[in-house]
A protein has these predicted regions:
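N-terminal secretory signal peptides and thylakoid transit peptides that target proteins
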Residues: 2-20
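Glycine-rich, histidine-containing beta strand-loop boundary motifs that form or position
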Residues: 16, 78, 164-165, 273, ...
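Zn-dependent metallo-beta-lactamase
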Residues: 18-25, 29-73, 79-91, 223-231, ...
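Flexible, acidic/histidine-containing loops and adjacent segments that form or flank the divalent-metal
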Residues: 32-51, 58, 106, 112-113, ...
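Conserved protein kinase catalytic core
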Residues: 63, 83, 129, 280, ...
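Long, structured stretches of catalytic cores involved in phosphate-ester chemistry, encompassing
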Residues: 131, 290-387
Length: 420
């Protein structure tokens, strides 16, 4: 039986006013998020429900700080690389501190926390975990030196460190080197002290779970897509091995990188360390770990360029399958990025960019080599911050000055509407 409800004029007016008020409240909330932080002003503090992703520019390697909607903190890599004179970007802010110290200080300023819930070390290279020499200071227990990841840990204690394979790397360890011995010594010291070190659990959607108010943000999701040559299939917790356990020759460390995807409502973010697609012109298809990871990641709003946009990464499948609106190149070397990679990420097939691409530190000689496209970068220097609105329906990009610790805003972009 259908019940007919008759509404008088007063009831209708009340309803209209309530709807108008709700619409105004929604518009005001969105307008509040859209209020652009002014050029030359400091970055406003993150508000509850927003998600921030900071690509930190030290000129010495990758480091990305993620502050989830509930305040859970994650750092992806803490690089402190070295290179021949003239081939590296200038140290940012300067060389008075080690890169890991700068990264930790940045995270302490912008995370609202004194500790990191998670550190993901994507793979075993200095520009992602830290280099050492005889002058690098020893940790308090004397078992390892402070650099990169261990420098961050000393200033901003890491709750859970996620490594691509710890403690059993099988036959996949890179050639012995001081930095590698130091990093493994650091992990052993952590484990001996009862501090958590985990192997990346490929396919897991729980290894990077929210720590503070998870139930308030049910649309936040994380997924470990790949590690040590194993890639998620896209089904449940199933995985597939891409790099053979006993390849015909020793695989380069980059193909073993951790890949991950974070999502919040309709927003999504991809990071894949130094995953690459170079197969020696088709001779060794298994060396392409980038393409299967991009395929399972699917369309993504913002993506960090694999391997700094270098010549062997960011191939056609990477850009086609991620289909990102924004790409961020964590560049610091004269070779970052390659011309084809820049054109591909920009979608500049008619010489005009159709996607927004940002670089944390474009080397002047690289800008010259890439002059056909470098002028179309949205930024060539500075910390690149993705600020996602509560709920994930939109986001903005803010570029911060990396020449000192004031980190004043030098550019604002967006808002971008998340496509889901």
């Amino acid at each position: 039986m259908t019940k007919t409800v008759q509404l008088d004029r007063r009831t209708l007016l009340k309803g209209a006013l309530c709807l108008a008020g709700a619409a105004l409240s929604t518009q005001q909330g969105f307008a509040s998020f859209l209020e652009a932080d002014g050029i030359g002003s400091p970055l406003a503090a993150r508000r509850e429900g927003e998600m921030d992703i900071h690509h930190i520019d030290t000129g010495r390697g990758n480091s990305t700080l993620v502050v989830a909607p509930d305040g859970t903190t994650l750092m992806i890599d803490a690089g402190a690389g070295t290179g021949p004179a003239g081939t590296m970007s200038a140290a940012r802010p300067d060389e008075s501190r080690r890169p890991g110290e700068w990264q930790a200080r940045y995270a302490l300023r912008h995370s609202g926390s004194t500790a990191l819930d998670y550190m993901v070390v994507t793979h075993l290279h200095t520009d992602h975990l830290g280099d050492v020499n005889d002058r690098t200071p020893l940790a308090h227990d004397g078992t390892y030196r402070l650099t990169g990841v261990s420098d961050v840990d000393a200033l901003m204690p890491i709750g859970t460190l996620i490594d691509r394979a710890w403690p059993d790397y099988g036959n996949t360890l890179p050639p012995s080197a001081p930095y590698l011995t130091n990093y493994l010594g650091y992990l052993k010291s952590r484990a001996a002290a009862g501090r958590t070190v985990q192997k990346a659990d490929v396919g897991s959607d729980q290894q990077l779970a929210l720590k503070k108010h998870a139930t308030q943000y049910p649309t936040f999701k994380s997924r470990i897509l790949a590690a040590s040559g194993v890639v998620w299939t896209g089904q449940g917790h199933e995985t597939q091995r891409i790099v053979p356990e006993n390849p015909p020759f020793k695989a380069y460390e980059n193909v073993y990188s951790i890949g991950l995807r974070l999502s919040y409502g309709r927003f999504s973010y991809y990071a894949g360390g130094d995953l690459s697609a170079d197969t020696s012109d088709g001779r060794y298809p298994w060396m392409d770990t980038e393409s299967p990871v991009a395929r399972v990641a699917g369309r993504t709003e913002v993506a960090a360029a694999n391997h700094h946009g270098y010549f062997d990464a960011c191939g056609p499948e990477f850009v086609r399958d991620l289909d990102a609106q924004v790409y961020i190149i964590q560049s610091w070397d004269i070779g970052h990025p390659g011309p084809a990679q820049m054109q591909r990420m920009m979608g500049a097939w008619q010489n005009k960019a159709t996607r927004d691409v940002f670089a944390t530190g474009l080397h002047p000689q690289n800008a010259l080599m890439n002059r056909r496209f470098s002028g179309q970068l949205k930024s060539q220097q500075g910390h690149v911050v993705v600020r996602v609105a509560p709920g994930g329906d939109s986001y903005r990009i803010l570029v911060l000055d990396s020449s000192d610790e004031r980190n004043l805003i030098t550019g604002t972009f967006g808002p971008y509407r998340s496509r889901g």
